[in-house]
């Protein structure tokens, strides 16, 4: 094992590992999502294991790798992958309906540069992703966990941001978008305190034209929420 490879279960303290950043809802899958899941899971999904992924073997190239944590229904994920065939994308999601929906998009558009892992993202990062192997993280509209007592569950919070930083290559980035101002302020503070990360902008980033509008973004705008974007880079 070289110095850049993972050391299992050492990045996030044990008491934090029991704190989940999501609630596993049991929503129904549509018939189409079920068909996609059954037909294409083995083709486009990577089973969770405690062995690191070799991205060059997986994608059959050495293109940059971007990981999206919590892709929802995956519409924006598929669009970004389609628009950027020179980059590889790994989407991590726990909700079967979203996995089923995105599987259909991947198959229909033949997105050979996109794969899925259906599992808890923190465990995936700890056990399947080598240190200094990722070119970027996309975190679009994560659960804001609005009540103060639940802020510890937020994905963009230390020590989870320390874990993200360790997985990034030098020059890699974390791109977060949220419509909850309190979360944006908190995330900026947490990321600013994370070793080796620095904001690309004085504070919030301008809207990135290449990012498609998501369903959650439309809901936030309908409620007149302000969309805040953060981009931090590893130096």
Curated annotation (Swiss-Prot):
Binding site for S-adenosyl-L-methionine: 68, 93, 120, 143
Catalytic function, reaction form: guanosine(46) in tRNA + S-adenosyl-L-methionine = N(7)-methylguanosine(46) in tRNA + S-adenosyl-L-homocysteine
Class of the enzyme per the UniProt entry, highest EC level: transferase
InterPro entries: SAM-dependent_MTases_sf (IPR029063), tRNA_(Gua-N-7)_MeTrfase_Trmb (IPR003358), tRNA_methyltr_TrmB_bact (IPR055361)
Key words of the record: Methyltransferase, S-adenosyl-L-methionine, Transferase, tRNA processing
Active-site residues (renumbered): 143
Chain sites annotated for binding substrate: 147, 179, 214-217
Gene Ontology cellular-component terms listed: tRNA methyltransferase complex
EC number assigned by the record: 2.1.1.33
Family: Belongs to the class I-like SAM-binding methyltransferase superfamily. TrmB family.
Listed name of the protein: tRNA (guanine-N(7)-)-methyltransferase
Organism, as annotated: Treponema denticola (strain ATCC 35405 / DSM 14222 / CIP 103919 / JCM 8153 / KCTC 15104)
Lineage: Bacteria, Pseudomonadati, Spirochaetota, Spirochaetia, Spirochaetales
